[in-house]
Amino acid sequence: MAEEEHVSAVESGPLADQYRLSLENRIIHAWLKPPSARLGIDCRVEVTQVPGGEVVGARVTQCNGDASVRQSIENAVYRASPLPEPPDPALFHRTFVFEFKPQ
């Protein structure tokens, strides 16, 4: 039970927020914006990684951008590999979904 409480506390705490932000920033900085990209892009991306952060899968599941934008986002995830390691092992998830909203 203590293990579950630790995982729950870590996943809802500031370390989790910091880790999510580092993942999102790494991917957004790897993004090569296609000519068809417009302001207000909002996409959900499913990422699969292995321990060590190597990306083995990336798929845009929902997006208000066209096919070119979707493909560019998936490519950015692969370019961002390896992803940053979490500050606590409890934060590692083989598959996670994040919201891609570049400014």
Q: What annotation goes with each model-predicted range?
A:
Residues M1-Q71, N75-R79, P86-T95, F100-Q103:
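Compositionally biased, low-complexity segments enriched in charged/polar and small residues
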